[in-house]
């Protein structure tokens, strides 16, 4: 069992026969009245998001999520193919189960495939990836006095904001959880 007061991003639990993952949470302590936890939850089966408020003492059964390392092979339009690194079995997954999780992942990289009771519902990319900048405008010295950013396209086709000193051909580290530039490699 997990109490609502212990919620963190990524926690999964069962509620009304469904499995939800906490996307956002906020502990609220109003001046008058009891404290509560405001959450944004994602139904891991349907992908729908809902907002729900809990009492911090509410308890729900924790959902056991299996995470298995698999190699992302390729996509052929609507299906994305992953290979089990131990048994070499291939697993096709539809875009509806993956969402934007692969926008920073290159082919042949290892990702975690998430499942509950044998039903695959999504993937988890590595927390940090290193990608090459394939397109960005040149930054000029003296453009700004503060840390300004410019748009850049990385080798997977995703768009990201980078500092002005990053140029085409640079390798950069990206946090896949937030989609933010971390550093130049």
Curated annotation (Swiss-Prot):
Family per similarity comment: Belongs to the elongation factor P family.
Pathway listed: Protein biosynthesis; polypeptide chain elongation
Keyword Protein biosynthesis: yes
A GO biological-process term: peptide biosynthetic process
InterPro entries listed in its UniProt record: Elong-fact-P_C, NA-bd_OB-fold, Rib_uL2_dom2, Transl_elong_fac_P/YeiP, Transl_elong_KOW-like, Transl_elong_P/YeiP_cen, Transl_elong_P/YeiP_CS, Transl_elongation_fac_P
GO cellular component, one term: cytoplasm
Pfam families: EFP, EFP_N, Elong-fact-P_C
The organism of origin for this protein: Acetivibrio thermocellus (strain ATCC 27405 / DSM 1237 / JCM 9322 / NBRC 103400 / NCIMB 10682 / NRRL B-4536 / VPI 7372)
Gene name for this UniProt entry: efp
Main location, first listed in the record: cytoplasm
Disulfide bonds: none
GO molecular function: translation elongation factor activity
Record localization: Cytoplasm
Keyword terms, alphabetized: Cytoplasm, Elongation factor, Protein biosynthesis
UniProt function note: Involved in peptide bond synthesis. Stimulates efficient translation and peptide-bond synthesis on native or reconstituted 70S ribosomes in vitro. Probably functions indirectly by altering the affinity of the ribosome for aminoacyl-tRNA, thus increasing their reactivity as acceptors for peptidyl transferase.
Protein name: Elongation factor P
Domain of life per record: Bacteria
């Amino acid at each position: 069992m997990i109490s609502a007061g212990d919620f963190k991003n990524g926690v999964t639990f069962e509620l009304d026969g469904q499995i939800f993952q906490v996307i956002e949470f906020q502990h609220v302590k109003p001046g008058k009245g009891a404290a509560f936890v405001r959450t944004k939850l994602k139904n891991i089966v349907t992908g729908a998001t809902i907002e729900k408020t809990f009492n911090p003492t509410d308890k729900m059964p924790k959902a056991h999520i299996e995470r298995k390392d698999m190699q992302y092979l390729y996509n052929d339009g609507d299906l994305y193919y992953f290979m089990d690194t131990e048994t070499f079995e291939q697993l096709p997954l539809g875009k509806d189960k993956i969402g934007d999780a692969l926008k920073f992942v290159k082919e042949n990289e290892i990702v975690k495939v998430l499942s509950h009771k044998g039903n695959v519902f999504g993937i988890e990319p590595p927390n940090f990836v290193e990608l090459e900048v394939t397109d960005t405008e040149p930054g000029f010295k003296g453009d700004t006095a503060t840390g300004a950013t410019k748009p850049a396209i990385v080798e997977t086709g995703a768009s990201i904001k980078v500092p002005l000193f990053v140029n085409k051909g640079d390798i950069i580290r990206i946090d896949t959880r937030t989609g933010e530039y971390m550093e130049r490699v």
